[in-house]
């Protein structure tokens, strides 16, 4: 499959798009054995390219042995972006996508998206909150926004698998109206799509989000607000009906927090 927006059709006319992205110079943000992410410019505009090489049979088998779906290339993220746009969830804008080869171990692919300019991650935005709490209405609006996004994607068969505050971006200049927030979901290369999101993957996403918010002054009331919106139920009913899920989320988030704390330098 190949998709090129009109400006990329003109820029890459007569060339093999996969070869173009594999040989293009840019500011490298991440370089792994089978995936490279870099920034480049075209016609004065910024873009990000994720270029995937073949992952190899060992990587595929390792994932299957652990009952995980292997990420073979850019298709995951391309399809996740399509799903998010259909749900009116703000995210990256794809401008070019291609996939070459039918062998899953050697398949090559790429995805190019528009740069999100003037943004800050929610993780960085919320870091000062533990010492300097935000305005109540802003925090309330952000909790509502995250709960609504989480409910929407999970109820429509999408789970992120790396669902942390750092994978949401927002404008670094806030709207004066707290209820007019815009969050952009990013880094969807491991996302999964189904007709329904299984419980285990809801737990993984929500425990990741909770873990990433533990050091920003999240209160019990904030959690309750999130739960009410996510379930669409009165609080008591939501806590009772999904008690085992909330317990699993709490346990998994605490375990992740403790594991990551052990990895930090002792003087952190």
Where do the language-model regions lie?
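N-terminal presequences and immediately downstream first alpha-helices
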Residues: 1-16, 40
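C-lobe/activation-segment region of protein kinase-like
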Residues: 180-254, 258
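Hydrophobic residue at the +6 position relative to the catalytic HRD Asp in the kinase catalytic loop
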Residues: 163, 167-174
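AlphaC helix of the protein kinase catalytic domain
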Residues: 121-133
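Conserved ATP-binding subdomain of kinase catalytic cores across diverse folds
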Residues: 14-122, 151, 155-156, 245, ...
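Catalytic-loop of the protein kinase fold
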Residues: 155-165
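Short, solvent-exposed loop/turn segments that connect beta-strands within catalytic domains
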Residues: 102-107, 173-181
């Amino acid at each position: 499959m190949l998709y090129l927006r009109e400006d990329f059709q003109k820029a890459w006319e007569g060339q093999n798009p996969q070869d173009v992205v594999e040989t293009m110079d840019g500011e490298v943000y991440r370089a792994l054995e089978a995936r490279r992410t870099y920034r480049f410019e075209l016609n004065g505009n910024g873009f990000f390219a994720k270029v995937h090489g073949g992952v190899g049979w060992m990587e595929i088998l390792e994932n299957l042995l652990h009952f995980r779906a292997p990420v073979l290339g850019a298709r995951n993220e391309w399809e996740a972006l399509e799903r998010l746009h259909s749900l009116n969830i703000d995210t990256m804008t794809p401008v070019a996508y291609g996939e070459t080869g039918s062998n899953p171990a050697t398949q090559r692919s790429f995805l190019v998206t528009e740069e999100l300019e003037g943004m800050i991650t929610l993780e960085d935005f919320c870091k000062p909150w533990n010492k300097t709490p935000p305005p109540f209405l802003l925090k309330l609006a952000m909790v509502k926004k995250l709960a609504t996004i989480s409910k929407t994607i999970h109820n429509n068969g999408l789970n992120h698998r790396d669902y942390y505050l750092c994978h949401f971006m927002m404008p670094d200049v806030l709207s004066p109206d707290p209820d007019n927030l815009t969050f952009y979901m990013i880094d969807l290369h491991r996302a999964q799509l189904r007709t329904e999101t299984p419980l285990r993957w809801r737990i993984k996403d929500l425990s990741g989000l909770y873990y990433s918010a533990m050091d920003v002054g999240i209160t019990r009331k904030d959690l309750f607000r999130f739960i009410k919106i996510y379930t669409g139920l009165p609080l008591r009913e939501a806590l009772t009906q999904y008690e085992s899920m909330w317990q699993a989320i709490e346990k998994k988030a605490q375990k992740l927090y403790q594991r990551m704390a052990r990895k930090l330098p002792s003087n952190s």
